[in-house]
Amino acid sequence: MPAESTASPTAGLSRRSMLAGAAAVAGSAAALTASGAEAAPLSAGTAAAPSAADRITEQPDRTGGHARATVFKNVRPYGAKHPVDLTVVDGVVSGDPAPRGAKVVDCKGRIALPTLVDAHIHPDKTAWGEPWVTRNPASSIAEYTEEDVKLYHALRTPLKKRAERLMGHAVAQGTRAMRAHVDVAPAYDLVGVEGVGSARRALRHALDVEIVAFPQHGVIRTPGTKELLEEAARTGAIDRVGGIDPIGFDEALEEHLDVVFGIADRHGVGVDIHLHERAATGMESLRAIIARTRALSLQGKVTVSHVFCVPGLPERELDRLAADLADAGISLTTVAPSSDLVLPIDRLREHGVEVGLGSDGVRDSWSPFGNADMLHRSHLLAWVRDARLDEELEAAFRAGADGGARLLGLPEADLEPGSPADFLLVRGECLPQVVVDLPRREMVVRGGRIVARDGELVGH
């Protein structure tokens, strides 16, 4: 955010702070107005279905199968003023004229945007699509994990089906890839890894998925967990091994990291550690993770998620830490939980630290909220960062699209020739408005193929 003028009598106050003060003076009516920014959008996001004349239309491919070619006519990349034709050949955006007889999709002036990447989600825990779950009070990780186990046994739908349902919904809302954290503990054995792995195979035409074996119950404090993590990595069922709060929860920093980094080193998998620890405790764990990454030459293969010890660091300390993270090739993820816990993405990126955005839990025992919609998560990121300017709203979208792609090692779907033809189509005037209004995803395209229409998967 740009610094406010020191000459202003309100210097140091954000727009939201000033609105809150005005609401307190003006009374309940003003308070309702100030809080309305969090309400569901009432414009494009809830617009009626298009008329028959305004619907996106398709004409079949008549190339004889020599090339999988489609022309998406009348699209406005990123909300450009004038529509263009986007040609896709064999799943890639092409700068050449389309082959004669190519399939034609008339997009009627819709905005085309890159599909997004969910860099941190827990699809195994979800109750998405299930009957309402009444949650019990919980105030510690240990208590939440107990609630996880209760919910796991209470849900009648198999984990595989629940995960696939949620992951398919994510695709229909415009997600092209995700990193799925899956609980591994004696309470579940490897059921979650197997279930999410099955969902990954079922959706491979539409979604790239990395699986993290996540020791939610602790690596050291729960006997049998490290053996399950080892088995998951040895069998090739996972892409990364996880960890959680080595000091604050597992109470064994060195032993915890010995197990996690040892598995990564032996089996050639990456690392993604949940770090909720704050202040000095979190910094001690983070510094130890940096040291292990360097010692084992795992640059580019380690991510730390949440990292609540980073927001609020003094500028000099943040700059030193960011330089060390970049040097070690360690990436970070945030789920934009609140203004005081969201990562300082811009400052980290200035130092070369990749930062991804994720959904976290979706309708699980931890929270009744969540929807696996990364456009909505970009909206939430903009909200907690007090975005106001167009470029600030666009940056929130870029965090959900490009930040996650870089973190997962995927090419950016930037709609330029040579890029993967992964995009979504929505109504709207411009990208900033889309971030605010959250319009219906009328079409989602993966590798040039239409995989979803109006929020529903097609051909699945």
Locate the predicted segments by residue.
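Active-site gating loops and adjacent loop-to-helix segments of metal-dependent hydrolytic enzymes
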Residues: 126-159, 240, 267, 285-303, ...
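Alpha-helical scaffold segments that flank or form the walls of functional sites
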Residues: 129-181, 187-202, 228-234
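Divalent metal-coordination and catalytic microenvironments
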Residues: 75, 91, 109, 120, ...
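C-terminal cap of metal-dependent C-N hydrolases
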Residues: 417-460
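His/Asp/Glu-enriched, well-ordered alpha-helical/loop segment
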Residues: 292-302, 346-428
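N-terminal metal-binding scaffold of metallo-dependent hydrolase/deaminase domains
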Residues: 1-101, 431
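Active-site core of metal-dependent hydrolases
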Residues: 206, 212-223, 235-343, 354, ...
